[in-house]
């Protein structure tokens, strides 16, 4: 099992770990209107799925802002950001921070994303939240890039991700 750290704590990731080449599971998530939606989108060249513990964290907010900026530069790419935050909180934070071009989704109801993508934090003070991670799916829903950030307090490797999308 893969492990990540937050300050002095080490967490085992729970769920089924996906690897590059796997077909990504289509899971149910909750949007800002409290409606259930499927994760996988049709008709896009690439889908970037970015998970983070909570939009209330400063590094998490930087991650969301970075992907929000990329939406206009990469029109053939769909960007989704997923956390365990309640959709109301997600909407308030994104509205206050000008994050409006991302698909913001919550895994709070079923934890299906965390469990099916292997990024659910195990025992510790952040138990039940999502590990900071990024998946890129191709137009057939196959994982072509995966990064699980080892230290939750660090941002993903944006340069490596952008190379995959070009």
Curated annotation (Swiss-Prot):
Thiol-specific peroxidase that catalyzes the reduction of hydrogen peroxide and organic hydroperoxides to water and alcohols, respectively. Plays a role in cell protection against oxidative stress by detoxifying peroxides. GO terms for molecular function: thioredoxin peroxidase activity. Its EC number is 1.11.1.24. PROSITE patterns: THIOREDOXIN_2 (PS51352), TPX (PS01265). CDD domains: PRX_Atyp2cys. Transmembrane segments: none annotated. The gene is tpx. Residues 18-166 form the Thioredoxin domain. Belongs to the peroxiredoxin family. Tpx subfamily. The active site is a conserved redox-active cysteine residue, the peroxidatic cysteine (C(P)), which makes the nucleophilic attack on the peroxide substrate. The peroxide oxidizes the C(P)-SH to cysteine sulfenic acid (C(P)-SOH), which then reacts with another cysteine residue, the resolving cysteine (C(R)), to form a disulfide bridge. The disulfide is subsequently reduced by an appropriate electron donor to complete the catalytic cycle. In this atypical 2-Cys peroxiredoxin, C(R) is present in the same subunit to form an intramolecular disulfide. Disulfide bonds join 60-94. It catalyses: a hydroperoxide + [thioredoxin]-dithiol = an alcohol + [thioredoxin]-disulfide + H2O. Homodimer. Keywords: Antioxidant, Disulfide bond, Oxidoreductase, Peroxidase, Redox-active center. This is Thiol peroxidase. Pfam families: Redoxin (PF08534). The active site is at 60 (cysteine sulfenic acid (-soh) intermediate). It comes from the Bacteria. It comes from Helicobacter pylori (strain ATCC 700392 / 26695) (Campylobacter pylori).
